[in-house]
């Protein structure tokens, strides 16, 4: 609690702290109850603390995946953890299904790094309240986003070999 309290007293804001054996479980623990709390989520606590939670609470599981899982009768993280891995992969794809099935079981082998790795790419995204339906609407936004990315790349003295533009809908 010492670090959490020091941040609150010296900087004036609250933080949640999650403690566990891997990054996934520590992050899940930090989201249990807010604000200004310390929680644990050790492997032996997974069945009582994590598995009763709805699948939407699993780290990195988005709305589209949640919908597919709930339509298949998988409503909790525990349901997902107890499903066959191939069933989750069929619903979510091989790579995402494997990763999320492991997460539901509390497995995360990603290393803790003292220094962040250098970014492999530069990106920017914008969410709109209303659908974009014409080129005239999207062009100024696209130009602004290109300028933002180009500025970051110049600052880091980077060049690129490809550019990708993605448009997504909530559907």
Please state what every model-predicted region is.
Residues 65, 70-171:
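DNA-contacting surface of Y-family translesion DNA polymerases
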């Amino acid at each position: 609690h010492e670090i959490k309290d020091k941040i609150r007293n010296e900087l004036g804001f609250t933080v949640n702290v999650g403690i566990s054996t891997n990054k996934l479980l520590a992050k899940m623990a930090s989201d249990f109850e807010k604000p200004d709390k310390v929680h644990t989520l050790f492997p032996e606590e997974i069945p009582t603390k994590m598995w009763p939670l709805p699948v939407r609470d699993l780290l990195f599981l988005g709305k589209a995946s949640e919908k597919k899982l709930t339509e298949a009768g998988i409503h909790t993280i525990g349901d997902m953890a107890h499903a066959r891995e191939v069933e989750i992969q069929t619903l979510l794809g091989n790579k995402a299904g494997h990763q999320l099935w492991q997460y539901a079981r509390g497995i995360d082998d990603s290393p803790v790094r003292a220094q962040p790795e250098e970014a492999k790419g530069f990106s920017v995204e914008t969410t709109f309240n209303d659908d974009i339906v014409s080129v005239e609407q999207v062009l100024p936004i696209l130009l602004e986003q290109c300028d933002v990315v180009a500025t970051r790349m110049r600052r880091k003295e980077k060049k690129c070999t490809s550019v990708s533009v993605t448009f997504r809908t909530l559907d």
